[in-house]
Amino acid sequence: SARGYAWCGALTALLTGQSYVTSAEMAKQHGAFPGYYRNRDHMLRVIRNHRRAAWNAEKSEYEGLTVKPTGINAAYLPDDLVQRARKVWDKALELGEVHGFRNAQVSVIAPTGTIGLLMDCDTTGIEPDFALVKFKKLAGGGYFKIINNSVPPALSRLGYSESEVREIITHATGHRTLKGAPYINH
């Protein structure tokens, strides 16, 4: 129903908008996510477009979109809910322009498998990664194995040398476990 869409849109706007506010606050303290500055203009365009959807902007106001997103339909919602959703996106944009964001993505609606891979992320939201090594199905058939991107820097931080990290990663990718990996204290 139109009312159901409006409520889902407003609640999702609040959830995602507040998550980006928090992400910007985290970036102020700990720095933006790796690759943020390389993608800053695109990231801020996405945030501006989300903000416009919260304000139910006209199609001509969106940047780089050919299809107008469904904005929040205030006719079916309590005014305070609409205002909170709009204010949180105003704040997300304001803080993001100054500090960047700690997270590239903060929420997603499935399917997620390839989306995260294309965005250079292990996960596309707040959920933890489900495996140390994952299989990615290829469109043309077959699979390839990928290791969680946080593993190499974690091993380096633990004091392993570059060559040790490479050997550990090779073992983990091949065996899908750290068990039996060289240099690991089992």
Predicted regions located by residue number:
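Long, C-terminal-biased catalytic regions of enzyme "large/alpha" subunits
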Residues: 1-186
